[in-house]
């Protein structure tokens, strides 16, 4: 197992949830955290529930750093409308999230690696910033060279995940379009996400 896989599954174990719905997640075998006292789960406090909601969202999107995640919260609150919905939209506009949703990569971690190495084009131009904000109508494509990578082809052919309807994707060409921003109900999370609890956490 690679170090990246180990880190990913460590997140699952620590949070006690199968964040990405993966068959090999250790949570499928036991639903408690790591360590000697992992089975002793108390009923969480309001703060504990808010913290868990934050950790799940941060972890799901590839363990986003605290400073970056706080900036997303601040932007979500600044915008009009429901702050929790705004937060989800901001997260789903990240280029690494879009590449993952389009099934050009099997995990958010692999998506980030693909972008960092310059293998993703946005509107025909190379973008190597995973946090890049994708806009409605933007075209996302895997570079020609990377289309032959085994892990890219395997991800695109996988039947484990469906592509959500706020994206339009040609899986053969490994090219897609960001159609619109999703609401929370549109996003195919394998586990329940509670962005409003995240807003409450930072609003304390």
Curated annotation (Swiss-Prot):
Region of interest (Disordered), ranges:
25-47
Entry function: One of the primary rRNA binding proteins, it binds directly to 16S rRNA where it nucleates assembly of the body of the 30S subunit. With S5 and S12 plays an important role in translational accuracy.
A biological process (GO) of this protein is: ribosomal small subunit biogenesis
Q: Kindly give the CDD domains that the UniProt entry links to this protein.
A: S4 (cd00165)
Q: Which InterPro entries match?
A: Ribosomal_uS4 (IPR022801), Ribosomal_uS4_bac-type (IPR005709), Ribosomal_uS4_CS (IPR018079), Ribosomal_uS4_N (IPR001912), S4_RNA-bd (IPR002942), S4_RNA-bd_sf (IPR036986)
What assembly does the database describe for this protein? Answer: Part of the 30S ribosomal subunit. Contacts protein S5. The interaction surface between S4 and S5 is involved in control of translational fidelity.
Which keywords does this chain's UniProt record carry? Answer: Ribonucleoprotein, Ribosomal protein, RNA-binding, rRNA-binding
Keyword rRNA-binding attached? yes
Identify the residues that the record assigns to the S4 RNA-binding domain, covering every copy. 93-156
Ribonucleoprotein as UniProt keyword = yes
Top-level division of the source organism's lineage: Bacteria
Q: Which family does it belong to?
A: Belongs to the universal ribosomal protein uS4 family.
Q: Which GO terms describe its cellular component?
A: small ribosomal subunit
HAMAP family, per the entry: Ribosomal_uS4_B
- What is the protein's given name? Small ribosomal subunit protein uS4
Pfam families noted in UniProt: Ribosomal_S4 (PF00163), S4 (PF01479)
List the PANTHER family hit by this protein, alphabetically: 30S 40S RIBOSOMAL PROTEIN (PTHR11831), SMALL RIBOSOMAL SUBUNIT PROTEIN US4M (PTHR11831:SF4)
Q: Name one GO molecular function term.
A: structural constituent of ribosome
């Amino acid at each position: 197992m690679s170090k990246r896989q180990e880190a990913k599954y460590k997140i699952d174990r620590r949070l006690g949830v199968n964040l990405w719905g993966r068959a090999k997640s250790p949570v499928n075998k036991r639903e408690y955290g790591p360590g000697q006292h992992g089975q002793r789960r108390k009923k969480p406090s309001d703060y504990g529930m808010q913290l868990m909601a934050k950790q799940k969202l941060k972890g799901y999107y590839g363990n986003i750093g605290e400073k970056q995640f706080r900036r997303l919260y601040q932007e979500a609150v600044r915008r009009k409308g429901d702050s929790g919905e705004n937060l989800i939209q901001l997260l789903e506009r990240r280029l690494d999230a879009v590449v993952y949703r389009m099934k050009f990569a099997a995990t958010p971690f692999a998506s980030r690696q693909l972008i960092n190495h310059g293998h993703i084009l946005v509107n025909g131009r190379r973008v190597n910033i995973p946090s890049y904000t994708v806009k409605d109508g933007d075209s996302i494509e895997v570079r020609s060279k990377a289309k032959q990578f085994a892990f890219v082809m395997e991800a695109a052919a996988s039947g484990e995940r469906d592509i959500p309807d706020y994206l339009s994707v040609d899986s053969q060409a490994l090219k897609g379009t960001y159609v619109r921003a999703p609401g929370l109900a549109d996003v195919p999370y394998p586990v329940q996400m509670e962005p409003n609890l995240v807003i409450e956490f930072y609003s304390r």
